[in-house]
């Protein structure tokens, strides 16, 4: 049996550990990682029926979170107009500068882009690694671009084909590329060389004209790259672009998944390596473009933000 003196020494020795344990119990939990949101075409940062509602849903489930919903312009109306007419590269530069100056983001942040905001935030991840983006969630983003108009009657329609060809005839002109946002991610699978040489945004971030190693390194630094596809999407054509798939080159009928594209097989962006490492997450939901239920959002998106 230990003597009283030995027990006293043991108690003294354990005292610092006991105090430390109690102190740790009273420490505040770490603040949740901030969230940056970029809205889609024709929307604004703070529409109570869209991004405003998303912000409230996130704040409800993650108390204390800092949510920055990007406003591109000085007014809500300007924000909406810029989603159509402000050069995408200029928008990305402006956002990168704003994020770098925000003291609440310096330890890292998650990002969630809706529709075209998905590929715009990917450009931020690739071009602006500081502050670091941790998870990127693309909700209906078009990462291989679009080659079709909203709610066309169908792939076999001669009218749709005619409209596509007409738009494509001017989509890659310098003036259109500089002034029309949607032209900057217009991707013609029939004239890949024209797209590759004249697309000032999408062809660049998808490494179509050469390999920018920093783009690849920065994208691969993401913990998770989550892509949400809408199974009944009537806006995005082809809908496979929401999972980084696209039309097979040379035609506009058959689509192929990401894993069969040259972007993946040549691993120009590191997507193949990310896929093998479990960094890519492919989610699908019923409904039309950006039609998400609260229940689905809470179950499938919130876990990547907590």
Curated annotation (Swiss-Prot):
It is found in: Lysosome; Secreted; Golgi apparatus; Endoplasmic reticulum. Changing residue 181 to M: In CLN1; late infantile form. Disulfide bonds join 45-46, 96-128, 152-160. The active site is at 115, 233, 289. Changing residue 109 to D: In CLN1; late infantile form. Changing residue 108 to R: In CLN1; onset in adulthood; retained in the endoplasmic reticulum rather than reaching the lysosome. Keywords: Disease variant, Disulfide bond, Endoplasmic reticulum, Glycoprotein, Golgi apparatus, Hydrolase, Lipoprotein, Lysosome, Neurodegeneration, Neuronal ceroid lipofuscinosis, Palmitate, Secreted, Sensory transduction, Signal, Vision. Palmitoylation reduces PPT1 enzymatic activity. Belongs to the palmitoyl-protein thioesterase family. This is Palmitoyl-protein thioesterase 1. It comes from Homo sapiens (Human).
